[in-house]
Amino acid sequence: MAQSVPPGDIQTQPGTKIVFNAPYDDKHTYHIKVINSSARRIGYGIKTTNMKRLGVDPPCGVLDPKEAVLLAVSCDAFAFGQEDTNNDRITIEWTNTPDGAAKQFRREWFQGDGMVRRKNLPIEYNP
């Protein structure tokens, strides 16, 4: 039963934050790499604190052990200095997939009693 084992670690490149640079009158896209450094298959989902400004593609998926995925984090145009950006971040959530599950993401994996881990990547906006 996969759910009794806590999910292992993931690595992200960059490791601690995402930085966008001005000007903000056009859409920016920044790529981050997520690596499943554990020995089990995981399902992951990405959340953002500001759905209007920030997007992530693909927003969810499944990674085999040692597999990596490149995510495109996009920031839509906005009025820098006139909007609150202090709490902007993306959150990566991941959990072990059930034994024998197909390699297809399922939202239910996050709604049961299995352990879900999270990693926050704050967004920094340079003027």
Curated annotation (Swiss-Prot):
Compartment list: Cell projection, Pseudopodium; Cytoplasm, Cytoskeleton
Signal sequence, start to end: none
Top-rank taxon: Eukaryota
Keywords from the UniProt entry: Acetylation, Cell projection, Cytoplasm, Cytoskeleton
Tissues expressed in: Sperm.
Any one annotated GO CC term: cytoskeleton
Keyword Heme on entry: no
In-chain residues carrying the UniProt-annotated modification N-acetylalanine: 2
MSP domain boundaries: 9-126
Endoplasmic reticulum is among the record's keywords: no
InterPro entries reported for this sequence: Ig-like_fold, MSP_dom, Nematode_MSP, PapD-like_sf
Function in brief: Central component in molecular interactions underlying sperm crawling. Forms an extensive filament system that extends from sperm villipoda, along the leading edge of the pseudopod.
PANTHER family: MAJOR SPERM PROTEIN, MSP DOMAIN-CONTAINING PROTEIN-RELATED
Anything else known: Around 30 MSP isoforms may exist in C.elegans.
The protein's name in its UniProt record: Major sperm protein 78
Annotated organism of origin: Caenorhabditis elegans
